[in-house]
Amino acid sequence: WYNTADKAHYIEGDDKNRTVLVPHTGSNKIFQFNFDSSTGVLKLKEGGVLNTGEQTGPRHIQFHKNGKWIYADYEQGNAVSLLRRSNGLLVTKQIVPSVPETWNGGGACAQLLLSPDSRFLYVANRGHNSIAGFEISKKNGQLSPIGFFATEANPRSFAIHPNGRWLYAGGQDTGKLAVFDRNRDNGTLLKRETVDAGIRPWWLQLVKY
């Protein structure tokens, strides 16, 4: 067992199998562990706790395929951040809202996913009931909004097909799944249909069989 902090919500490892990150929605911290793939042992990196600030609530985290850029969404802060490593430790390089600046209806971020080619980032917004899309700068990883795409109510989870052509978002309050065509050139989403998904769809996972 590894003691972290209040409300560890998610865990993500890098492609090199050396680093594991754990965001905490309750304590506003991201823990950075060294991972020994031969033993499975995690060890907290010295100085490896990033404080993201009060009322942020880091929830999900993803590594860009280049290994340099890391993205986290902030549940209470309705925002997404770009992180990098400086001397091996996480530092915040950018924070952008996940909802329109004119929105004052509250809500909370849920899931965060990169497109299969790591050119775009998507964040689910509960309350605003949307998927926010961002283009990723090839130069520095900075995020630029490309739009907010309406979903079913309370989109807690979504998934992107491995070929990048479709995005599926579950509406926890409606019991329906919204199916989007995804433009692989500009990242925009176009809703095609909604289908019944049972009672309060909690998590979406694409499975090959």
Question: Locations of the language-model features?
Answer:
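Beta-propeller fold detector
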Residues: 1-3, 42-50, 91-98, 143-150, ...
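Oxyanion-binding "anion nests"
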Residues: 73, 78-85, 89-121
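Conserved beta-strand positions in repeat-built beta-propeller and related beta-rich domains
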Residues: 14, 22-25, 64, 71-75, ...
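C-terminal hydrophobic structural anchor segments
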Residues: 132-180
